[in-house]
């Protein structure tokens, strides 16, 4: 596992965006051989999306031959609702870059057959071979996507009941009213994430410090979904300084020295 320790949330977003752009450009995608990118929602990736849009407008990257799969979607929330992940992605990213509409894949939380929707999502991912890079965030309790504590590390795309803590955390997007936050969501599984060629998780803020400590210094544990990254051959965690407060000094020193060339100039 790589840990990229930076100072600010803005630096995390810019580093992540640059990494994505470098991966896409090195891949040299075509219509017949697209780059497959997994994407998250929430507050954490906003700086990364902003940086990606800026780099696209500067002519540094095209998303014309990029196929995207989003991590999750609320169940029962109309896709036109401002807090649906469909709306979030179009508002913050898709509407500002040159990605074709047919290359965008989002789970349908209003599908008449939820199980079939989840099964077809997995099948579509497999039809591309694999996701080349999956970017994600993490919850205070260590969940990735909506794989809440005690999720199977072999799980696939499915419906999940959201914990009260997750709904409270997300209520900031619903005028602070937890009762407006859906109780269920569709989410890719831990196994889906682990199948990706590379997984990059962004960790911001002191409230995520315990989750980061569990990922880097703890044991693999289904109560801390983020710890599954230890099983992945190409996992990258990018964090700001407040998120490192639970790490041992020697751990942080080790990764600072290891990644010195990759964080220089930020």
Curated annotation (Swiss-Prot):
Q: Which InterPro entries match?
A: Glc/Gal-6P_isomerase (IPR006148), Glucosamine6P_isomerase (IPR004547), Glucosamine6P_isomerase_CS (IPR018321), NagB/RpiA_transferase-like (IPR037171)
Q: Per its UniProt record, what Pfam families does this chain match?
A: Glucosamine_iso
Q: Which family does it belong to?
A: Belongs to the glucosamine/galactosamine-6-phosphate isomerase family. NagB subfamily.
Q: From what organism does this protein derive? A: Salmonella arizonae (strain ATCC BAA-731 / CDC346-86 / RSK2980)
Name the reaction it catalyses: alpha-D-glucosamine 6-phosphate + H2O = beta-D-fructose 6-phosphate + NH4(+)
Entry EC no(s): 3.5.99.6
Q: What NCBIfam families does the annotation carry?
A: nagB (TIGR00502), PRK00443.1-5 (NF001685)
Q: What is this protein called?
A: Glucosamine-6-phosphate deaminase
State whether it acts alone or in a complex, and with which partners, per the record: Homohexamer.
Q: Name one GO biological process term.
A: carbohydrate metabolic process
In terms of SUPFAM superfamilies, this protein maps to:
NagB/RpiA/CoA transferase-like
What residues correspond to the site Part of the allosteric site?
151, 158, 160-161, 254
Q: Provide the function of this protein.
A: Catalyzes the reversible isomerization-deamination of glucosamine 6-phosphate (GlcN6P) to form fructose 6-phosphate (Fru6P) and ammonium ion.
Pathway info: Amino-sugar metabolism; N-acetylneuraminate degradation; D-fructose 6-phosphate from N-acetylneuraminate: step 5/5
Catalytic residues (positions): 72, 141, 143, 148
Taxonomic lineage of this organism?
A: Bacteria, Pseudomonadati, Pseudomonadota, Gammaproteobacteria, Enterobacterales
Record-level Gene Ontology MF annotations: glucosamine-6-phosphate deaminase activity; identical protein binding
Q: How is its activity regulated?
A: Allosterically activated by N-acetylglucosamine 6-phosphate (GlcNAc6P).
User: Would you tell me the Gene Ontology cellular component terms?
Assistant: cytoplasm
> Main EC class of this protein?
hydrolase
Record keywords: Allosteric enzyme, Carbohydrate metabolism, Hydrolase
The primary gene name is nagB
Sorted alphabetically, which PROSITE patterns does this protein's record hold?
Answer: GLC_GALNAC_ISOMERASE
């Amino acid at each position: 596992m790589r840990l990229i320790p930076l100072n600010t949330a803005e630096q995390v977003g810019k580093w992540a965006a640059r990494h994505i752009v470098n991966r896409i450009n090195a891949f040299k995608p075509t219509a017949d051989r697209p780059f497959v990118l997994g994407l998250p929602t929430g507050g954490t990736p906003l700086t990364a999306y902003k940086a990606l849009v800026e780099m696209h407008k500067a002519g540094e990257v095209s998303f014309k031959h990029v196929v995207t799969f989003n991590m999750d979607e609320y169940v029962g929330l109309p896709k036109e609702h401002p807090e649906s992940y469909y709306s979030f992605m179009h508002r913050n990213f898709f509407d500002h870059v040159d990605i074709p509409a047919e290359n965008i894949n989002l789970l349908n939380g209003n599908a008449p057959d939820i199980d079939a929707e989840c099964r077809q999502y997995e099948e579509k991912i497999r039809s591309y071979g694999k996701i080349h890079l999956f970017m994600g965030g993490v919850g205070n309790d260590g969940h990735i996507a909506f794989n809440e504590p005690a999720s199977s590390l072999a799980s696939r795309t499915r419906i999940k009941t959201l914990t009260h803590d997750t709904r409270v955390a997300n209520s900031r997007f619903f005028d602070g009213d937890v009762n407006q936050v859906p109780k269920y969501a569709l989410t890719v599984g831990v196994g889906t994430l682990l199948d990706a060629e590379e997984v990059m998780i962004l960790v911001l803020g002191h409230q995520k410090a315990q989750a980061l400590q569990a990922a880097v210094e703890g044991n693999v544990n289904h109560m801390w979904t983020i710890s599954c990254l230890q099983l992945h051959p190409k996992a990258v965690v990018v964090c700001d300084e407040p998120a490192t407060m639970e790490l041992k000094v020697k751990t942080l020193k080790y990764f600072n020295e290891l990644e010195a060339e990759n964080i220089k100039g930020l």
